[in-house]
C-alpha cells in the first residue's frame, strides 16, 4: 500500500482553495493592516500567501493579539485545554467584530 504523506498542507484540499472569483493576489491594504495588542482577530488563511501561514488546524479560530514579531503578529488561541501562540502574517488575520 502507498504510504500517506505527512506534509504541512495535507488534508486541506477544500480548506486551502479559493473560489474562482477570489483567485489572484490579495489587496495590498490587507498586508499593511495593523492590529493592537488585546484586539480579537479571526484566523482566515489566504492560500495565495505562503509566508507567515499558520497551521491549517487553526483556520477559522478566533484569538487575541498578544504582540508583534517582525511583520507577523502573535495570536493567542485556545486549542483543546491549552492556549497556544500562533505566529501569522496580517494577510491571514481579520478583525473580529462584536
Swiss-Prot record:
GO terms for biological process: translation. Residues 1-22 are annotated as: Disordered. SUPFAM superfamilies: Translation proteins SH3-like domain (SSF50104). GO terms for cellular component: cytosolic large ribosomal subunit. Residues 10-21 have a biased composition (Basic residues). InterPro entries: Ribosomal_eL21, Ribosomal_eL21_arc, Ribosomal_eL21_CS, Ribosomal_eL21_sf, Translation_prot_SH3-like_sf. Keywords: Ribonucleoprotein, Ribosomal protein. One of its GO terms (molecular function) is structural constituent of ribosome. It holds the Pfam family Ribosomal_L21e. Belongs to the eukaryotic ribosomal protein eL21 family. This is Large ribosomal subunit protein eL21.
